[in-house]
C-alpha cells in the first residue's frame, strides 16, 4: 500500500510536508496499486487580465514570480501543463474573437494581432522558465456571426455545413498562427464548459454535436 503525503505551500515556504491530523474513525480508502491514468502535469490558465496584473510589477518582480511558478527548481511550483483561451474568456479585458467579420467563411480577416499584445508575450515569458511547457486551448465562444443568436455570452453554433467547416478551419488557423510565433498548441478542446449557458462568453453543445464536429 502506498503512503499518502500531505504537501502544501505558504508565502514563506513552498512544498512543505505537513503533519497528518489525527482523527477518530477508520479510513475507508484503500489503494491497490492499480493505475488507470497518467497525470501529465499541473498548471493554470493564461488570460489577458492575468498579464495586465503581472505588468503592474517591476520587471524583476515579474521575473521572480514567473520563476516561482514555472521553473524546474526545487523551490518552484513547476507548472508544466497550462490552458489558454481562443478568443475572449471571462478574464479577457473585453469580449472578442479572432475573426468578427460576418460571413467570412474563408477567414480572410482572421488575426491573432490582439493576442500579440498580451497572451503571446505572457506565454513566451513563462516558457523562458519552462521551455517544455504544454498548452491546450479552447474557445469560450465562436465568432458571433457563427452563432444563433449572434452574441458572445450564450447561444449555439449555427449547424450548417459551410459554418461548421469555417469553424474547423478557425481552429486550424489558430494553431498555425501560434506556431509562427514559436508557440506549439499541444491540444485543442472544442468548447469550454459546453453545457453552460453563461453571462460571459459561452456556447452550448450537446454530446452528439461534439462527437459529430470532432469526427467530421
Language-model features: where?
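Extended, charge-biased low-complexity segments
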Residues: 2-5
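N-terminal catalytic cores of secreted or lumenal carbohydrate-active enzymes
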Residues: 10-185
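Active-site neighborhood of glycoside hydrolase catalytic domains
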Residues: 163-190, 194-216
